[in-house]
A protein has these predicted regions:
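Peptidoglycan-targeting cell-wall enzymes and recognition modules
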Residues: 3-27, 55-166
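Acidic, Ser/Thr/Pro/Gly-enriched interdomain connector segments
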Residues: 9-19, 211-247
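Surface-exposed patches in mature extracellular/periplasmic domains of secreted proteins
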Residues: 40-50, 63-67, 174-186
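Extracytoplasmic/secreted envelope proteins and their assembly/folding machinery
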Residues: 12, 29, 33, 47-50, ...
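Acidic helix/loop microenvironments that form the catalytic cleft of cell-wall polysaccharide enzymes
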Residues: 54-57, 132, 177-196, 250-263
Length: 283
């Protein structure tokens, strides 16, 4: 998908670099091209801040639903207000995400009581973890959906981006992006400064990549296997002198196994960093 609505050159290779380790980076790029300009997240500074902040909150765009799988000990430490300090025994809630959600989110953010199941239905979703009936209702109005419909939408790529952009716009975070103020954006998103160092690191890297001072590497030294896609797969295919479409299919796997066997490696069809370094002649 073309990125014609951005005010800078925004490429798929950039997103693959920034979402390194996310095998769906190409799909995220397509969704970003469709959604971000609609919310005026269209400059290098704004996109860098968006990807840095959302990447921190979602484990690099890989987690679209809140993880509430806490142990009893974890509940007492993370949510003492609802367990230890409230005199509630955490043992019955050990590794029970639904029960946990219905305790910690009951009777707030327009959620009903524990038995309503609202805590679970309206738990965190999307790349900025939209939470609570109130927020899902408000976002739903923006996209012409009910709160219940919105809970499903935010767990898709387009919906995750749309909901994050809605939050971004509602809280005027572009002004922090324009000022390159990572600390200010973090406070507005997080309510504090949790993860500030990681957010700053991601932002600096994003600015380097998006501002035109970065050249895409032919090979990213991470593990690729059947089902992987991207420039590293294409580079391997070119090295093996087979059809180079960037998709690691059964044919590519078969050729990789032959190459591995020829070079004294376990012929498992998986190319890790060491195998890639050997293939491309790097130490």
């Amino acid at each position: 998908m073309a990125a014609k609505d951005f005010k800078f050159k925004f490429t798929e290779e950039m997103v693959i670099e920034l979402l390194r380790g996310n095998e769906e980076a190409e799909d995220w790029y397509d969704a970003m091209c469709e959604i971000l300009p609609l919310w005026e997240i269209d400059t290098a500074e704004r996109v860098a801040m968006f990807i840095a902040q959302c990447g921190h909150e979602s484990n690099n765009f890989k987690v679209l639903s809140e993880n509430l799988n806490y142990s009893a000990d974890g509940l007492n430490k993370v949510f003492p207000k609802y367990f230890k300090n409230a005199g509630r025994d955490a043992a019955p809630y050990h590794r029970q995400p639904r029960k946990i959600a219905n305790i910690i989110y009951a009777n707030r953010m327009d959620n009903g009581p524990t038995e309503s199941d609202d805590g679970w239905k309206f738990r965190g979703g999307g790349i900025l973890q939209l939470t609570g009936r109130y927020n899902y209702t408000q976002f739903g109005k923006e996209v012409d959906m009910t709160a219940e419909q919105a809970t499903e939408y935010v767990r898709t790529k387009k919906g995750a981006l749309d909901s994050a952009c809605w939050f971004w716009d509602t809280n005027d975070i572009n002004k922090f992006a324009d000022a390159r103020d990572v600390k200010g954006a973090t406070k507005r998103i997080n309510g504090g400064y949790i993860g500030l160092e990681d957010r700053q690191k991601h932002y600096q890297h994003a600015m380097e990549v998006l501002s035109g001072h970065w050249e895409p590497s032919k090979v990213v030294y991470e593990t690729i296997r059947l089902g992987s896609r991207g420039p590293t797969v294409k580079a391997v295919q070119e090295e093996l002198e087979i059809g180079a479409d960037g998709v690691f299919g059964p044919g590519t796997e078969a050729h990789v196994k032959k190459w591995q066997e020829k070079n004294g490696l376990t012929p498992d069809g998986v190319m890790g960093p060491k195998s890639l370094a050997m293939m491309f002649g790097e130490d």
